[in-house]
């Protein structure tokens, strides 16, 4: 896109890649892209890498999938800043995204956002995660959803009242039911 838009300064088209935690740390293509990111012909002016870190790769625990504590550690090979945020706190995710964009635009370098979260359901419709990760999924099932946590925050700080919030949920559910 940068080529076709004649974006020679690499400022108008911002590459963004979304990765799973296991894929980011385990697929060689990520390391290859980092290794080539500073080379003429491969430089994008910095890519924003977003890791959806659900702390499990299909059914594999992180300690069996990589040698480092965080999947984002791979970004250290190019000194990319790594921003960790809580997936249950949408405002922290937005804050990290703003920092990432500002950094990328100013320094033309890659940046990594590691959204630490969880997968409430299995890897796919045929996966029952409590078979392979019983302790983790016992905790996840008792943990409130991000929507519930953030909704309560907005209600408690007076951003929205409960009836308006419930109306938004109802309207959203109705739109989903209609296929919108």
Place the predicted regions along the sequence by residue.
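Single conserved hydrophobic/aromatic residue that forms the stacking wall/gate
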Residues: 170-180
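Glycine-rich ThDP/TPP pyrophosphate-binding loop and its adjacent helix/strand module
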Residues: 1-169
């Amino acid at each position: 896109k940068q080529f076709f838009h004649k974006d020679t300064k690499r400022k108008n088209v911002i590459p963004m890649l979304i990765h799973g935690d296991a894929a980011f740390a385990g697929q060689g293509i990520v390391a290859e892209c980092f290794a080539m990111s500073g080379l003429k012909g491969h430089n994008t002016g910095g890519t924003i890498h977003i890791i959806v870190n659900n702390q499990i790769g299909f059914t594999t625990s992180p300690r069996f999938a990589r040698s480092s504590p965080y999947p984002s550690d791979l970004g250290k090979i190019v000194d990319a800043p790594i921003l960790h945020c809580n997936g249950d706190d949408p405002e922290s995710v937005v804050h990290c995204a703003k920092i990432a964009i500002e950094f990328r635009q100013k320094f033309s370098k890659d940046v990594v956002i590691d959204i630490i979260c969880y997968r409430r359901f299995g890897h796919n419709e045929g996966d029952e995660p409590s078979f392979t990760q019983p302790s983790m999924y016992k905790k996840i099932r008792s943990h409130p959803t991000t929507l519930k946590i953030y909704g309560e925050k907005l209600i408690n700080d007076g951003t929205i009242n409960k009836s308006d919030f419930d109306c938004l949920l109802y309207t959203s559910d109705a739109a989903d039911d209609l296929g919108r």
